[in-house]
Amino acid sequence: MMSTTVRLNRFTYLTSTAKLTRYFCSHHLVDRSETALHEVIRIVSSPVGGLDDLEENLNQVSVSPSSNLVTQVIESCKNETSPRRLLRFFSWSCKSLGSSLHDKEFNYVLRVLAEKKDHTAMQILLSDLRKENRAMDKQTFSIVAETLVKVGKEEDAIGIFKILDKFSCPQDGFTVTAIISALCSRGHVKRALGVMHHHKDVISGNELSVYRSLLFGWSVQRNVKEARRVIQDMKSAGITPDLFCFNSLLTCLCERNVNRNPSGLVPEALNIMLEMRSYKIQPTSMSYNILLSCLGRTRRVRESCQILEQMKRSGCDPDTGSYYFVVRVLYLTGRFGKGNQIVDEMIERGFRPERKFYYDLIGVLCGVERVNFALQLFEKMKRSSVGGYGQVYDLLIPKLCKGGNFEKGRELWEEALSIDVTLSCSISLLDPSVTEVFKPMKMKEEAAMVDRRALNLKIHARMNKTKPKLKLKPKRRSKTKKKNLQH
């Protein structure tokens, strides 16, 4: 009995020892692989050395590449490393792994290169993809086509679409819609229409997406006539335009009227909104913001305020964007009191704008030389506790000091340091002996006007002095008068 117990204890001890050995060995291997991974990431992400140096350094690392390692390295380095270094690392991995790499790794790297908009790197990898008979998935093609069109290579995007079968990727509803969307995103609508007519049979079920893309493309070109025709084609096909379609038409119309007919902005936009309601589609704050943005660019102050009030009456609550466009045009046209009043109204209604709202408007006020109003708006920003005050301090302190208000500039500097805000501007700005004080632009313009007027008066006086006096010629007697005298 005792010998049996001893044997059992011995077996248990040996089993536990074996488990501990395996545990420590596995942890040692994990540590080694983690170290190798970090070393590869360091080499790939290093900005020092060329591409040949990169490959040479990778060869010196004692690491066995794997699909998982490739994905991890690319994911870790994609944001801060140049696409060419990522491509060279992937090529080095392909040499080591060969057919062990799956199609999904090729597609992943191609999507990363497309996101980084490196046309040459994309072409190299697409060529490798085709040589090795790899399959490109539909999502990858969509991203590649969109990127190529963005960088002005729409012909390349169409070329890849035509030979999708060589990438084992079908020309189905998804890929046809993707190439049409990519082309229309930069206004190449005629090319998109060509693709659409050649593949009518495969876009069945995706008609709404295709019409949306066409409308967006015509809005990029500001072609209201063609955009209207697309809406009519949708009605003829029994497809009801949605909010996106009407907003695209509204954008097209408003952008065209900014340059051609600013006074027609409001009536024509309201007609489109009336048409939207006939389809039981209520205009949203985004619809109104399209109009408000264009009204602001044309400095239509009264219409901007009226549209804001109309939004409230119609039950469409303005958002922070609506208030921003109206306040901005008020500040730019010198209606500072009215602008501040609308900001207060927005805060009272419970809106909590993001820091960009305040930062942009403070920039506008500084640009029109109204730093006192900018300081008031900054106080409202601090009361709302949105954070991100560093940029505002960096804007206001130089503006105050260069305007001669060193006392207020120093006060803001000390305030920023007290709340641990890191400033980018130099402390030398607070020194009047170093910082040059600029006169306001209006004073300079007025002085220039006075100088111009004085110069014009001098020129006219000089011309009057040198101008020779002309003797008036005696009037000739008419023939009738001579005859009368003779009689």
Swiss-Prot record:
Keyword annotations from UniProtKB, A to Z: Mitochondrion, Repeat, Transit peptide
InterPro entries, sorted: Pentatricopeptide_rpt, TPR-like_helical_dom_sf
Compartments it resides in: Mitochondrion
Residue spans of the PPR repeats: 137-171, 172-202, 207-241, 242-283, 284-318, 319-353, 354-388, 389-423
Region feature Disordered, mapped onto this chain: 466-487
Record: transit peptide: 1-90
GO CC terms: mitochondrion
Pfam families: PPR, PPR_2
The keyword Repeat appears for this protein: yes
Family according to the record: Belongs to the PPR family. P subfamily.
Protein name per Swiss-Prot or TrEMBL: Pentatricopeptide repeat-containing protein At5g61370, mitochondrial
